[in-house]
Structures are given as C-alpha cells and as structure tokens.
Regions:
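Cytochrome P450
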Residues: 1-432
Length: 432
C-alpha cells in the first residue's frame, strides 16, 4: 500500500495515525469516485470492495437520492453483515430504512429531538457540563476523553429514562459496537454488577462470555447474538418506561420486535458514541489552534459557529454506506446494481469546491455547509441535542480551566468509521 493508494481509506490502522487528509485531497482531484478494496482486517473476512465518494456534491447527491442509493438493501456499514439473518435484523433499524418506512419510524420519536424539546434540556445539560468540569478543576490535569464521556451518557439516560446506576452499560455497549476494531474497546466491561439495578444485573447475565464463537469466528458486534444483554435490557426498560421518555414513545409506537430492538441500539450507541468522539475531537482541534481557542475564550458569542467549524474539521462519523438499486453513473464512473457506495463526509467537509481554504480552521467561517450530520432524509435526528451538548462542554472547559493545553500526545481510536480518541491528556492552571 503506497501513500497514494485509495486502499488506505479503508485501513483502520491508517486512522489510528490520523485521518489521511492529504490522500483525500488527492483523491478529490484525481479519483473523486473510485474503487476501494476490502481486505481482511484481523479476524474479519475480506469483502467485495466498494465505490468511495469523496467530493461534496457527489456525497450530497448520494445522500438525497434514496431511490437510487439505498440504505436498506445492504444496510449502512461498509462491512456486510455476516449472514442473511443478520442483514434482515439490522434492516429493521431506522438508520437502515428507505422512505417511506424510514419516515414512519422517525415520526415515533422525532418529538423528543425538536429544537423546542432540546431547549427544555439546555439548562440541565449546561449545568451538568459545568458540574463535570468543576469536579476536576482543582486537579490541574485530566484525560478529557474520560471527563467528557459522562455528558452524552448522562444526557442519553435522561432522554431514555435509564436509571443512573445503569449508565455504564451504555458505555460498554457503545465501546463494543463502535470500537470493535480497537483492542482497548472491543471487549469493554466497565459496568460493575454490584452497582447496577436488578434490571441491569439481569441483562448483564445475558452478555456473551466471549466475543468469539466456539469455532473461532468472531461475533459480529452489531448482531443480536453479540448484543443479547443490550436487547434484554431494552425490553426490561420498556416494561417500566418513564412517562414522556423516548422509551415510552417507542413502546407506544407500534414497532415490531426487531424495529424496537434496533431503535434502542441506535439511540444507545449512536446517541452516545458520536458525542464521545466529537467533543474531545472538538477540544483537541481548538487546542491545536491557539489563536482560535483564545478568540473563543474572549468571545462566547462565537461558541455556536465554533461548534459548526469543529464539526466540519473533525466529523465524528467519517463515512456511511449505500447500495445502488440499479445501474447508474456517479462521478463519471459506471456503478452496477447491488454495488456498495460509501460516501466520505470527512473528505466532503474539506472540498475546495465548497470551502475557501478548507484546511484552515476558522471559528467565524460562514457559510459552513458541512455534512457531519448527513444530508437528505437521514439527516441526523439528534443534531440539535448534539450541538447543545458540544457547546455546553466546550464552554465549561474554556471558561473554568485557565491555561488549558495538551499534557501529552492524544491516542486515536483504531476505526475506519468513527473519528475518535481514546485518550486526550490535558492540563491547566489551578491558581484561582
């Protein structure tokens, strides 16, 4: 694999060293739609390869044309589900639906994520962020990944009605699903059974003893088999939902069993992990641009636009897959029916055709047509809540940790999907 080989955009290890922005820049110019192979990665088998899409306009075209580029046919992850049964199961997820089925599921829970609903949460989210930062302010140092991880888990628990004692289960499920390519997260077991509710302990007993089957093949981390404990918990929680919570809406929404389980999966994992990756990434980006950090410190009114620019610069999710429903042309290439098409938001967000000086980090940038929350019918349902949490955590850190700076090298998540950090050591002055 050479420095200019498109195959590098699939290699999870490449992202552990940093997003290959120089390669994306070259591919936008020379091969804006190109074939990328899928070699075996560790115990995971090779795949048939896919069409990678790098330019902003082409990414938008794919995302807004579900009749041509389906989320349902092969689901939305690069890697194919292991079996036809696994594919049938994950197809029930809202994320993996095409219109009109997608809209039916989205309507069931959409009211919990409207701007008005999120505004009602804003004060408690901000208070929680300041409490988290205040609890460590006198220490002078922390791992910001660990510090910031509590806010999305806490917020998700509030929205879903998950008891405080069971919040660590959400962390473990996210780690196992999103971080399966990273040895630090692949077998996450941070929940202490002694601290869980009886409902949580009963669910934990359903967790597979090993991420590997008896025949030596790995469990698909997104399968019903691998997540038996999560789905057991989902059903138990639905039997006692807090009125008005997302769980109550799901229970009353007429979902099938598979739809219900997959919707719980979507909120418990995507609603958690995206922020766990995005908030530390946003802070790291600011720390690496001291002038912009200082501007944000002095001018709180720039917080909203700063969040948009950190999202553009550090999209928490780097790509999503679609499957061609018929033969078509895309970026001058012939795509056949049934072939995978993977759009790279992380590349589109730096497309020179859309963004002036795209590698420049500028918290006053306007307009800022980034695609970090997607586009079209699958635009992120939780975008308003994600923005609120990111603003709250960044503002708390900037305002309450004087002289905030790196205290060592960050450690990146090994993943070709999530743009994450596993560690971000920081320090600050404790002179006030």
């Amino acid at each position: 694999m050479t420095a200019h080989d498109p195959a590098a955009v699939f290699d999870p290890a490449a992202y552990a060293r940093g997003v290959p922005h120089a390669l994306f820049r070259e591919l936008r110019e020379t091969s804006p739609v190109c074939r990328v192979p899928e070699p075996a990665v560790g115990p995971w088998p090779a795949g048939p390869g896919y069409w990678a899409v790098f330019r902003h306009a082409d990414v938008k075209h794919v995302l807004r044309t579900p009749g041509l580029f389906s989320s349902h046919l092969g689901a939305t992850q690069i890697r194919d589900p292991d079996t036809p049964g696994d594919l049938d199961f994950v197809r029930a997820m809202m994320l993996n639906q095409d219109p009109p089925a997608h809209a039916r599921q989205r309507r069931i829970v959409a009211a919990a994520f409207t701007p008005r609903a999120v505004r009602e949460l804003e004060a408690v989210v901000e208070a929680r962020a300041h409490a988290l930062v205040g609890a460590v302010a006198r220490q002078g140092a922390a791992d910001f990944v660990e510090l910031a991880a509590d806010l999305p888990v806490w917020t998700l628990a509030q929205v879903m009605g998950v008891p405080e004692q069971d919040r660590r289960l959400l962390v473990d499920w996210s780690n196992r699903v999103i971080g399966y390519q990273d040895p630090e997260h692949a077998a996450s077991h941070t929940a202490d059974p002694a601290e869980l509710t009886p409902m949580g302990r009963a669910a934990l007993a359903e967790r597979p003893a090993s991420p590997v089957r008896a025949d030596g093949t790995p469990l698909n981390p997104r399968s019903r088999e691998a997540l038996a404990d999560m789905f057991a918990y989902a059903h138990a929680l639905a039997d006692r939902p807090r009125p008005g919570s997302v769980m109550a809406r799901m229970r009353e929404g007429g979902l099938s069993r598979a739809e219900f389980e997959n919707m719980f999966f979507l909120f418990a994992v995507a609603g958690n992990e995206t922020l766990r990756n995005g908030v530390p990434g946003a802070l790291l980006t600011l720390l690496d641009h001291p002038g912009q950090y200082e501007a944000l410190r002095r001018r709180p009114e720039l917080t909203a636009s700063a969040v948009e620019e950190t999202l553009r610069h550090w999209p928490p999710v780097m790509n999503f897959r679609r499957t061609a429903t018929r033969d078509t042309e895309l970026g001058g290439r012939h795509v056949r029916r049934g072939e995978k098409v993977v759009v790279y938001h992380v590349s589109a967000n730096r497309d020179e055709r859309v963004f002036d000086d795209p590698d420049r980090f500028d918290i006053t940038r306007t307009p800022n047509d980034h695609l970090s929350f997607g586009f079209g019918p699958h635009f992120c349902l939780g975008a308003h809540l994600a923005r609120t949490q990111t603003r709250a955590m960044l503002r708390a850190a900037v305002d309450r940790l004087p002289g905030l700076e790196r205290a060592g090298e960050p450690v990146r998540l090994t993943s070709n999907f999530q743009n994450g950090l596993t560690h971000l050591p920081v320090r600050w002055r404790t002179d006030r």
